[in-house]
């Protein structure tokens, strides 16, 4: 990624020194699948009173460019950023969303969480009505998802009532998300899962992204295996036995860091023992995240240590799974890259591996037999030719001193033909026939005129 010159003056890109020597250690890119964007302003008292924690605020705790620097220093390619938007004060939040989209494209994958204060003041669920949600999305067409929708928050409860995932207010939201091909991200509790599973089946074209330790691990594994439109992000507040959120003993930088450092190595062993089998069973469905939210989470001493914990954890996974968990699964879910691997369990049965192994073995044996036989034949032929060459070969030599006619006679006899009469040796005869007196050639046997034999 090319960094503008101005960044060299404002952001220190020197790599952070590791505090722990844990190997193997993942050093590749990351994509944070659960990052709470700092609010545009401090929430009003009526909202702050209902929140169980303090949230980070832009320019109070970190600048917008400082946030990008925070990501760059840790080789975090991008984040899934959750923007809280209050319907009575939306403009500042909308400006923040547009700022990152225009100045730092592809660094923050915007998820919108509109909270309807006006609905809440009327003692109704603070879920933004569908018509208003459509207006927001028209202004923010780059929005990729809706959430984090935390069903456990007190704003979604009153007396004995609880907002259900299949209530009419939520159905209206799902219809809009399906039409716009957006992701629904939620933090459900155990009591929310039956209604959510109905929605997962009713809206197969919506991707449902979950996180949270309330979902029991056996149930999570079953859901990931059954539904192709469900993903899960495993975040810091689960990969730590001293927890980042809502723990009075560690709810500040000063109390968190000592305990986190003391338990770092043991935490790695414990969490890998628990999560490694689940991640490797569903290598295309689980992704890394931070759940950064509070002001001290983005502290320059805390955040690097959290990243070190994550990289140590990823290094303990199967190398074939590490990049998928670190960033590739999130990119595929967001539609940032194409892939030929479907987000389903595509494990090849063991019997197919055995069958393939047997076939390969048979083919290897046949090949070796053929090669061996060919080598033996070649050796035999070579020996025969060598012996023949040494003994003079099988070629029949022509007699060097035999008379031509004798050679011809032998040849004709071999061919089954009668040999021609051999010429008599020349001998002197009388010069004329004794009977008729005709002159004769010296070697004739009969007189050409009267036929008398010449002896």
List the predicted regions and their residue ranges.
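Selective detector of the "anchor" transmembrane alpha-helix that sits immediately C-terminal
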Residues: 366-386
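Acidic-and-aromatic substrate-binding clefts and catalytic sites of carbohydrate-active enzymes
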Residues: 42, 56-62, 83-93, 117-129, ...
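Catalytic pocket-lining loop regions of alpha/beta-barrel enzymes
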Residues: 162-288, 296
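Active-site gating/metal-coordination segments in enzymes
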Residues: 9-18, 88-184, 254-256
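Hydrophobic faces of well-ordered beta-strands that scaffold small-molecule active sites
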Residues: 31-35, 78-81, 108-113, 146-148, ...
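Mid-to-C-terminal alpha-helical segments outside catalytic/metal-binding sites
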Residues: 3-33, 38-42, 47-78, 281-285, ...
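Cys/His-rich metal-coordination motifs, chiefly Zn-binding "fingers/knuckles"
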Residues: 422-455
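Acidic/histidine-rich helix-loop elements
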Residues: 35-62, 121, 156-162, 242-245, ...
């Amino acid at each position: 990624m090319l960094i503008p010159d101005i960044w060299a003056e404002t952001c220190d890109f020197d790599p952070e020194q590791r505090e722990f020597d844990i190997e193997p250690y993942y050093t590749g890119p990351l994509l944070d699948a659960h990052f709470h964007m700092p609010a545009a302003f401090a929430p009003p008292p009526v909202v702050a009173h209902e929140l169980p924690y303090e949230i980070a605020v832009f320019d109070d705790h970190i600048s917008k460019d400082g946030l990008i620097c925070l990501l760059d220093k840790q080789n975090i390619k991008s984040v899934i950023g959750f923007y809280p938007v209050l319907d009575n004060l939306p403009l500042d939040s909308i400006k923040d969303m547009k700022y990152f989209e225009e100045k730092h494209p592809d660094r923050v994958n915007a998820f919108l969480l509109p909270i309807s204060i006006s609905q809440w003041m009327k003692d109704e669920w603070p879920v933004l009505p569908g018509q208003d949600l459509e207006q927001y999305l028209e202004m923010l067409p780059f929005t990729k998802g809706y959430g984090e929708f935390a069903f456990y928050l007190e704003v979604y409860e009153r007396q004995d009532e609880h907002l259900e995932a299949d209530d009419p207010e939520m159905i209206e939201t799902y219809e809009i998300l399906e039409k716009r091909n957006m992701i629904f991200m939620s933090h459900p509790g155990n009591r929310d899962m039956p209604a959510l599973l109905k929605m997962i089946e009713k809206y197969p074209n919506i991707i449902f992204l979950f996180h949270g330790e309330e979902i029991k691990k056996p149930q999570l594994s079953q859901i990931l295996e059954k539904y192709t439109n469900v993903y899960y992000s495993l975040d810091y507040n689960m990969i730590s036995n001293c927890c980042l959120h809502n723990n009075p003993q560690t709810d500040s930088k000063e109390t968190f860091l000592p305990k986190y450092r003391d338990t770092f190595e043991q935490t790695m062993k414990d969490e890998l023992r628990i999560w490694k089998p689940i991640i490797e069973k569903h290598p295309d469905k689980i992704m890394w995240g931070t759940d950064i939210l509070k002001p001290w989470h983005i502290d320059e001493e805390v955040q690097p240590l959290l990243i070190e914990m994550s990289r140590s954890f990823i290094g303990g996974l199967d190398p074939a799974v590490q990049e998928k968990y670190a960033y590739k699964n999130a990119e595929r879910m967001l539609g940032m890259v194409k892939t030929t691997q479907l987000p389903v369990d595509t494990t090849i049965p063991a019997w197919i591996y055995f069958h393939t192994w047997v076939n390969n073995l048979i083919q290897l044996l046949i090949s070796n037999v053929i090669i061996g036989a060919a080598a033996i034949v070649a050796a035999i032929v070579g020996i025969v030719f060598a012996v023949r060459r040494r003994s003079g070969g099988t070629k029949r030599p022509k007699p060097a001193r035999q008379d031509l006619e004798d050679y011809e006679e032998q040849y004709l006899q071999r061919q089954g033909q009668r040999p021609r009469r051999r010429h008599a040796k020349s001998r002197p005869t009388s010069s004329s026939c004794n009977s008729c007196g005709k002159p004769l050639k010296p070697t004739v046997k009969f007189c050409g005129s009267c036929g008398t034999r010449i002896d």
